[in-house]
Curated annotation (Swiss-Prot):
Full protein name: Synaptotagmin-13
Family: Belongs to the synaptotagmin family.
GO molecular function: calcium ion sensor activity; calcium-dependent phospholipid binding; SNARE binding
Tissue distribution: Expressed in brain, spleen, kidney and testis.
Gene source species: Rattus norvegicus
GO biological process: calcium-dependent activation of synaptic vesicle fusion; regulation of calcium ion-dependent exocytosis; regulation of synaptic vesicle exocytosis; vesicle-mediated transport
PANTHER family xref list: SYNAPTOTAGMIN, SYNAPTOTAGMIN-13
Vesicular side, ranges: 1-6
Keyword Transmembrane helix: yes
One Pfam family of this chain: C2
């Protein structure tokens, strides 16, 4: 037992020494077999023969040669062809057209070098599609006009025309106006157009109109007009066909009208024909501006909504004194001649075209709507002093023109906002 401790210590020492020697031997053997494995990649010398292809190293070696010689363009470089319109007028400034040739007064020069010939070919290809400047170096203004269109030019100056056909049904006692077509000039205003027909007799008049169609130079309607007319009234009746336009603000205007006697002598029945519309001269407006507003009625809530949007071209005798001051609109609800309620919009700075965008609401029973009306007054007022009336208008069945038609459209289309322009008067 006493000798076992030294023996164990000696064995452990010998084992440790043997392990260290074995590790050193293995390390030396590895260094001998791979002498460059321990070096960094940048310290290794590339071996072209043993190099293997990889992602960052190609399998083939390329040699790049640097040269300081200038790169010259190819002598046969072609420019893209430029196509232009054929000139409407013969002019010496325009060349390279099949029917026009340009003579040269200079004699041909001596043959040049190949490089000069290449440059001349390039210059010739470019200048064939360009303009020749005058010799004095001054470039005159060239007026470019679009292609002349005879049909468009004729339609600009011609009067509007209407195509129609008249037929009469004796059993139904009705007059039919079919094959409706309209030809108008390009400068007529309005986005949409329609035809309104009316027959006037001794006892009164009846009227009908077509649907709105997108206004074009040549507009065609697939539908016709049906007007009730007794056979005994046919010889004395007068038919009026009116071509009207309607813009995006629901403003209606007349392009022209055609009046025909139905006695059978001037207008044969059953024959299609063209008629020239007579345009009425526009009288100068005596108003003081226009106002744009929309109205609608809510039957479930018994409410009348009036939206004051804006006005334009406001002027009066006192307009110079009211510049820079406030402008408002007073809205009055009336039933027949009795005033029910009145409200006023906010004030806007007095300009030629003021904008409000304000809604005014009135409570009005449905049974009173037919006999009611709305009166508008545009007022201008300064910081001190009384207000001045700039214009007024009244909407209702008692009115005429656009003021009456606006109220009728509101009655026909409940719960729908309908906007129109109205002329102001003093």
């Amino acid at each position: 037992m006493v000798l076992s401790v030294p023996v164990i210590a000696l064995g452990a020492t010998l084992g440790t020494a043997t392990s260290i020697l074995a590790l050193c031997g293995v390390t030396c053997l590895c260094r001998h077999m791979h002498p460059k494995k321990g070096l960094l990649p940048r310290d290794r010398e590339p071996d072209p023969e043993k190099a293997r292809p990889g992602v960052l190293q190609a399998a083939q070696q390329f040699n790049v040669k640097k040269s300081t010689e200038p790169v010259q363009p190819r002598p046969l470089l072609k420019f893209p062809d430029i196509y232009g319109p054929r000139p409407a007028v013969t002019a010496p400034e325009v060349i390279n057209y099949a029917d026009y040739t340009l003579g040269t007064t200079e004699e041909s020069a001596a043959p040049a070098s190949p490089q000069a010939q290449s440059d001349s070919r390039l210059k010739r290809q470019v200048t064939e599609e360009l303009f020749i400047l005058p010799q004095n170096g001054v470039v005159e203004d060239v007026c470019v006009m679009e292609t002349w269109n005879p049909e468009k030019a004729a339609s600009w100056n011609q009067a509007p025309k209407l195509h129609f056909r008249l037929d009469y049904d004796q059993k139904k006692a009705e007059l039919f106006v079919t094959s409706l077509e309209a030809v108008t000039s390009d400068h007529e205003g309005g986005c949409d157009c329609y035809i309104q027909g009316s027959v006037a007799v001794k006892t009164g008049s009846v009227e009908a109109q077509t649907a709105l169609k997108k206004r074009q130079l040549h507009t065609t309607w697939e539908e016709g007009l049906t007007l009730p007319l007794g056979e005994e009234e046919l010889p004395t009746a007068t038919l009026t066909l009116t071509l009207r336009t309607c813009d995006r603000f629901s403003r209606h205007s007349v392009i022209g009208e055609l009046r025909l006697g139905l006695n059978g002598a001037s207008v044969p029945l059953g024959t299609a024909q063209w008629g020239e519309l007579k345009t009425t001269a526009k009288e100068p407006s005596a108003g003081t501006g226009e106002v744009l507003l929309s109205i609608s009625y809510l039957p479930a809530a018994n409410r009348l909504l009036v939206v004051l949007i804006k006005a334009k071209n406001l002027h009066s005798n006192q307009s110079k004194e009211l510049l820079g001051k406030d402008v408002s609109v007073k809205v009055t609800l009336k039933h027949q001649a009795q005033k029910l309620k009145k409200k006023q919009t906010k004030r806007a700075k007095h300009k030629i075209n003021p904008v409000w965008n304000e809604m005014i609401m009135f409570e009005l029973p449905d049974d009173l709507l037919q006999a009611s009306s709305v009166e508008l007054e545009v007022l201008g007022q300064g910081e001190e002093g009384p207000s001045c009336e700039l214009g007024r208008c009244s909407l209702g069945l008692h009115a005429s023109g656009s003021e009456r038609s606006h109220w009728e459209e509101m009655l026909k289309n409940p719960r729908r906002q309908i906007a129109m322009w109205h002329q102001l008067h003093l």
